[in-house]
Swiss-Prot record:
Gene3D superfamilies: 3.30.70.330, E2 (early) protein, N terminal domain, subdomain 1, Papillomavirus E2 early protein domain
GO CC terms: host cell nucleus
Bias (Low complexity): 213-231, 285-299, 334-343
Protein's name in the database: Regulatory protein E2
Family listed: Belongs to the papillomaviridae E2 protein family.
Post-translational note: Phosphorylated.
Alphabetic keyword roster: Activator, DNA replication, DNA-binding, Early protein, Host nucleus, Isopeptide bond, Phosphoprotein, Repressor, Transcription, Transcription regulation, Ubl conjugation
Cross-link (Glycyl lysine isopeptide (Lys-Gly) (interchain with G-Cter in SUMO)): K437
GO terms assigned for molecular function: DNA binding; DNA-binding transcription factor activity; nucleotide binding
Transactivation domain: annotated span: 1-201
Organism the protein comes from: Human papillomavirus type 5b
Localization, UniProt: Host nucleus
Gene: E2
Amino acid sequence: MENLSERFNALQDQLMNIYEAAEQTLQAQIKHWQTLRKEAVLLYYAREKGVTRLGYQPVPVKAVSETKAKEAIAMVLQLESLQTSDFAHEPWTLVDTSTETFRSAPEGHFKKGPVPVEVIYDNDPDNANLYTMWTYVYYMDADDKWHKARSGVNHIGIYYLQGTFKNYYVLFADDAKRYGTTGEWEVKVNKDTVFAPVTSSTPPGSPGRQADTDTTAKTPTTSTTAVDSTSRQLTTSKQPQQTETRGRRYGRRPSSKSRRSQTQQRRSRSRHRSRSRSRSRSKSQTHTTWSTTRSRSTSVGKTRALTSRSRSRGRSPSTCRRGGGRSPRRRSRSPSTYSSCTTQRSQRARAESPTTRGARGSRGSRGGSRGGRLRRRGRSSSSSSPAHKRSRGGSAKLRGVSPGEVGGSLRSVSSKHTGRLGRLLEEARDPPVIIVKGAANTLKYFRNRAKIKYTGLFRSFSTTWSWVAGDGTERLGRPRMLISFSSYSQRRDFDEAVRYPKGVDKAYGNLDSL
């Protein structure tokens, strides 16, 4: 008991000497934190032995002493690392190396030169908030190298420069939603207005926000909308003239067209092409061509794929088929329709030459109904849409792959229960990844722990890396690390099972190759 009291009094004397000397050296600050660590360890030991008071000093609970000891150890490690940098000979005070300054925004950095910044919300002087802008910010990169950066303020917030990158540690728009109602604020530095009142929806270049959309910019938008609606009406009224003069088949579609106007436009184009082609046919095929043109123009509205085939083969796929087969939609056919189709086939047979008839016979015209049934089956399967195929019992997983998903996969997927189409769609996608951002040591610890605890839930980890400024070699932002996976299901299982460390952010992505 007496030995603990004597040691505690000796540590108190050392702390008083440090405070009275007020040395502005980094070595004195390291000594100060080492003394605080010894004091916390001594109080922890005394509480563990059941001692509740050392002289006039009450002994706190063990959790408090443990927290203070860990805090002192962390500050000693930071200051010893700073002592090996180029900034060790700068003046450092007790305030500069205190935990309050170290934990204030931007958190985890040493800071000097506080400057008050006043922000007035809603143009109300009583509704103002004070912020601290630090003149200099000392931060460590992924290579444990210290850098000194200047801090600044603009209408977006308070930031410090990492090369040419502005790292904001205070955003005024976030507090404008909390303290204000109109979303407007005014920035003052040393009682001088630096930026006039701006709104939270209009700061240009604000991270995570849209471009300027103030009141003056909204007026032209309204007038443009009115002009667009007027032009849409004029376009609808002049639609027949446009369809006649338009010669290109795949012209650009106007965004304001409705589905009904698009269908009418396709029908008018089909009638125009069918009439121009029917004039160039031979006189012996006049009746056949006219009936084919009528059937072709009628079936245009249903499907474009069948229309293109009927146009190239000179017959309608929905009313008359060569092999006497049935229509894909209607299973029965009236006798009049069957007789008209028989008449048309006989007329075409008389008009065709023997050479054409022989060439067509080589493709399977013999066998009549059987050959027509085979050709009809091939046409219906090729012209049906993927959605129609899936509705017949296909797997819902066989969806199309967007252009952004196409890439080189690292492994060949299994063809079990998917078929050839499902295999191609799965192989078209890019390998998935997860990018994590945080402190370099935290990411390294997370990688080592995941390799042991989550084996089989990932493909590989990358080393920690950082972005580099375009005009220099200085690192920007926090360190990053990539985690690759063999499939999206593996990434989902990994994301559900893993626990990310505190202060680590994640994002999903995919790459063409690894």
